[in-house]
């Protein structure tokens, strides 16, 4: 009975997390685009530092390491890297007939391919070695360099005052001047209705009253948009933790091995924010945010999360925590997104990627992967 109660509770938590996730993704996608426009920089760069931060993945990995489950942590890292590309980025492509990507997207997708290659080479080179911590230090340093490079690009973009801010203020000034020159306000329009019963004049006054309300509605400040963006990001992180924790417990209740839980259920759960953001980005024709969502997340995974895993992970568990098949799929996924960003995305590409991801999951489950539990 206790097992059934635990299973039902975690399924309910999973569903509740999905609702919070949708709210956070909607807030984030709207205000990221606005903030990027106000800062006069590419939405890709803003997303790389915000949405592209897999903080929930880092929490999951640290918790798994504290529980002496390095194999689950590695499985989650590999599974999430594959899911972000084949199951998240592909969903965004389904909502866009044709996607063209900017220069920032091309630069960082190539950086992802390089960093993924380095991560896998280090994973193979230090397999079972007590010196794996050295590889972890290198990956953490790479993460620091990545953050500095993105931050510097955003900073340089803010040095030039965006024209939109000036136009907003000038529009407000023109609206005020127009109001004064017309010689009417919303209050006067209302008084006109009382003094003159003429239907034509009443209609005209009502239209003028509505026009003044629209003119007097000022655009939101930059601080308000940043707050809304942060609120959406916070909702994404909290919902991701709830979903990841409940999915992990569901996996254990169903007697799945640690690695299978990491590469399938856990990676699917922790990458749900990327799926929501990719869908919204595709539906709203924001290819830059789609790339930032995927590439930024995977760079975070293979650098900071990978570095933490190498430094504090158990070498013997990491040795059996992955197969050549998983490493190959992870590397090919990075090649695929690099090629799509260079050539341009098409809807049929998203379909092919989704089919490939389903095949990956089927192979993982059929393999059993119970060696790590023996």
Give the location of each predicted region.
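Hydrophobic alpha-helical segments, chiefly the membrane-spanning helices
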Residues: 1-374
